[in-house]
Amino acid sequence: MTDESTPDAASAPLPAPVPPPDWTGDAPGARAEAGAFTLHTGLLGELVVPGGAARAAELEALAARAAVYATRARGEGTRRVYRSAWRAFEAWCRSLGREPLSGDPELVAMYAVRRADAGVAVSTLRVDLAAIRTAHLLAGVALDMRHPGLAMVVEGVTRGRGARPAKRAAPAVPDVLRLLLGACPPAGTALGARDRAMLLLGFGAALRRSELVALRLGDAEPVPGRGLRLVVRRSKTDQHGRGQDVAVWANPAEPGFCPLAALDAWLAHRTRAKDLDWTAPEAVRRERPLFCAVTKAGRATGEALSDKAVARLVKGAAERAGLDPALYSGHSLRAGLATAAGDLGANLADLMRQTRHRSTDVALGYLRPADLWRNNVTERVFGAGKRDI
């Protein structure tokens, strides 16, 4: 239920302990820093590792191979968050004249206190600690995350601040989504058609913003008499890319609020883009981006969008609709579908099948607001007064 600008890594527990790699040697491009070398990692970028020439023999080959495996082990969103968290810790250590990869749990505890004093959420602090621990693992430097001096600080921050997640993006429930659709550019334009299709597919398929912009032309298949079948090739809960099918029903009774109609309108513009070579095999065309950039002249370019484009779309439409754009984000579409389903009494299994949540706790968070009132005993106790509400 988190916004994908801050991936679910922000609410994940610390990684399970794994034995550190037995790396000895020096990495290519090592810094001319006494007793240290630079380790190139795929997950956290460059790490300056303490150690002398005795560690130089094997690291070059191992680091190159490890970078590949480390990059595959985490999604791009998680890698961005971890890199940012590690760089912040590294800069803080350097400002104190301390070695970031010292393996000193008390130094990490000091940083945790600093972050807590800065007001970061407990979930954010856990991401910071996960990144620090991962950096030490990659560098082969032991760090005891269960050291009492560190563990007690984290426990104290959690108890004092509470582990309740920070305020979420406002859900774009159907009434809000209609306002966003009405605030899009004219329907007959390529930009208007694209924006409407992105909003309705993002909502209907409960897509994360990275999933929405990753769709290819071959990933959306109309199903006669039903709607659309989307293939989400890779997601935060499917890092190995097995693929997940998502069904989205059409809404012919309300064409302006119909994902299938919106997609058809966009494809009329998309198929005229210059990147589609109609002499090429169909398999090649099917791999082109479903949603792409649109020029000021109103032509689809075929250039893929970044996930930030989804947030800009939602916030821009919210502002034009007279809503507070600060309350909405790219995650509002996914949250809107889940919230609406909860309001309509959807059960947990059906919701998780559509949203592809792996955590029941996260999915239940969308159902609880409605369940709070459903079959509540006070309805019977105070039922006589319902007519006056």
Question: Model-predicted segments: where are they?
Answer:
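Extended, non-catalytic subsegments within catalytic or DNA/protein-binding/adaptor domains
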Residues: 1-389
